[in-house]
């Protein structure tokens, strides 16, 4: 018998057959490694298109080789992207209620009534602090999901349908958008375009003056010189002293009225710096004398029972939104005022831009704060009832003779007889009707403004030695107008004419 190989040799040979030697493997060419498939394979072409029988065309879900791509197909993923979040109506309500820079009286709410459709009411007319189930009949409340939009002075600042948010700046794909707090310093609220707003240190127009008005830093801004700000002197009283009266801090009479003109002029710049721009404008400090301030505000402008220093940090009261005025319609009086304005331009040519147009000549008798068309309609009815009630003491005719310079910025003609008592009775009647009227610390002094320089301007009006003709300088007192205050650069808007008879 032949000899058998050792057991170990047999095992080694068997392993050599099963596993090739490393040298043998090195002689073989290496196969290229395929890259891992990270992208899914493209879908197969539409076989019906290849056969010429596809009826879907561009709507087909399978690719069509050689067919042009439909326009807008690349933008489809963006169109289906998630919209940026929009702050809810509840957020806007809380912001309006608790932000000290916002006045709830400046806002109105549009909501859906199940029976009447979309309605709009002032923000302050709603009850926001109680659940709906706890409210009884006669209380205006609305679920937050029925709120459709918010308006600020008639402008849309939050809208659910168009995803507009100018309160928080949400809803914009580019991030935080503009808000009413970021707008430039303007003054009016009605009829303005774009993002010109009046808030946070600028003039405001609102409905009512609630008790929290002492915390609102609201003042008047610059106004077009050709348009008189209604009740400019009376509004200055309210802005400068109304809030200070709430805080129990009023300046003593000697601070302004008891100082001579020569003593006041050297300290005018210093006082302007201490009070700041808005307070100094309201007080008429730049170039203003004690005598002109006394003539502007009247001797009763400073209450005797509260004689403390005027708080320089006291914010200004919000501006009125509407006013009641006697419009100058007599052609003879308009012609006399035009002659006075021409004489003013002849004496001071730089004052040509500050003349009040003849169509805007008026005397302000009452200042109101209204919000929305509903309150405007109610104000028209209340004004009609107030004028028809006896005891108004309205003179049949007014005459104008002298031109009075009220400070360095206002040239006016006071009427004869005066209208202080009539304006006071009218404001009391309107307030009794439930309207929000602005009451100045002293009496109102209605006057016919001939020229007016905006606050903050360095231009001073000169004193004129001009007298209006007594024969033609008259205006019958037969009708009054309810007007809406316009924004900066625009005139006021007459809303209703009401006869006194």
UniProtKB/Swiss-Prot annotation:
Pfam families the record matches: AKAP7_NLS, MJ1316, zf-CCCH
List zinc finger spans: C3H1-type: 40-67
Give the organism, scientific name. Homo sapiens (Human)
- Gene name on record? LENG9
Among the GO molecular function terms of this UniProt record, one is: zinc ion binding
Could you list this entry's UniProt keywords, alphabetically sorted.
Metal-binding, Zinc, Zinc-finger
Name of the featured protein? Leukocyte receptor cluster member 9
State whether keyword Metal-binding applies: yes
**Is this entry keyworded Ribonucleoprotein?**
no
Question: Which residue ranges does the record annotate as region Disordered?
Answer: 1-43, 61-86, 203-234, 281-300
The protein's matches in InterPro entries, at most eight in alphabetical order, are given as: AKAP7-like_phosphoesterase (IPR019510), Cyclic_Pdiesterase (IPR009097), Leng9 (IPR042653), MJ1316 (IPR040459), Znf_CCCH (IPR000571)
């Amino acid at each position: 018998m032949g000899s058998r190989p050792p057991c170990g040799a047999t095992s080694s040979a068997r392993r050599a057959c099963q596993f090739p030697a490393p040298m043998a493997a090195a002689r073989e060419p290496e196969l290229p490694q395929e890259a891992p498939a990270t992208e899914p394979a493209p879908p197969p072409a539409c076989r019906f298109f290849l056969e010429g029988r596809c009826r879907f065309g561009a709507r087909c879900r399978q690719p069509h080789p050689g067919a042009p791509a439909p326009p807008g197909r690349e933008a489809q993923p963006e169109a289906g992207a998630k919209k940026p979040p929009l702050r809810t109506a509840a957020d806007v309500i809380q912001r309006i209620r608790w932000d000290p820079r916002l006045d709830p009286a400046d806002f109105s709410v549009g909501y859906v009534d199940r029976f009447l459709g979309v309605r709009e009411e002032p923000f302050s007319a709603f009850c926001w602090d109680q659940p709906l189930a706890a409210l009884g009949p006669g209380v205006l409340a609305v679920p937050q999901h029925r709120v459709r939009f918010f308006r600020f002075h008639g402008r849309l600042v939050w809208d659910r349908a168009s995803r507009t948010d100018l309160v928080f700046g949400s809803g914009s794909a580019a991030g935080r958008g503009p808000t009413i707090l970021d707008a430039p310093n303007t003054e009016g609220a009605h009829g303005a375009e774009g993002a010109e707003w009046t808030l946070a240190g600028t003039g405001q127009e609102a409905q009512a003056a609630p008790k929290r008005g002492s915390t609102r830093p609201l003042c008047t801004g610059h106004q077009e010189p050709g348009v008189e700000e209604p009740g400019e002197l009376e509004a200055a009283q309210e802005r400068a002293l109304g809030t200070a009266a709430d805080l129990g801090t009023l300046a003593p009479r000697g601070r302004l009225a008891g100082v001579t003109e020569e003593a006041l002029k050297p300290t005018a710049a210093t006082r302007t710096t201490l009070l700041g721009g808005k307070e100094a404008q309201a007080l008429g400090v730049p170039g203003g004398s004690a005598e002109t301030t006394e003539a502007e505000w009247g001797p009763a402008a400073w209450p005797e029972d509260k004689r403390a220093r005027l708080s320089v940090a006291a914010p200004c009261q919000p501006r009125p939104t509407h006013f009641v005025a006697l419009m100058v319609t007599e052609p003879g009086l308009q012609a006399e005022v035009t002659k006075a304005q021409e004489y003013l331009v002849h004496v001071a040519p730089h004052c040509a831009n500050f003349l009040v147009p003849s169509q805007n000549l008026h005397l302000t008798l009452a200042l109101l704060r209204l919000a929305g068309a509903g309150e405007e309609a109610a104000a028209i009815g209340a004004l009609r009832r107030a004028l028809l009630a006896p005891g108004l003491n309205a003179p049949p005719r007014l005459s104008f003779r002298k031109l009075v310079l009220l400070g360095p910025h206002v040239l006016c003609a006071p009427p004869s007889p005066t209208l202080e008592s009539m304006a006071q009775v009218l404001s009391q009647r309107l307030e009794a009707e439930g309207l929000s009227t602005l009451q100045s610390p002293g009496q109102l002094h209605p006057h016919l403004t001939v020229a007016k320089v905006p606050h903050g301007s360095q231009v001073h009006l000169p004193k004129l030695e001009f007298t209006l003709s007594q024969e033609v300088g008259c205006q019958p007192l037969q009708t009054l107008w309810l007007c809406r205050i316009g924004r900066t650069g625009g005139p006021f808007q007459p809303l209703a004419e009401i006869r006194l008879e």
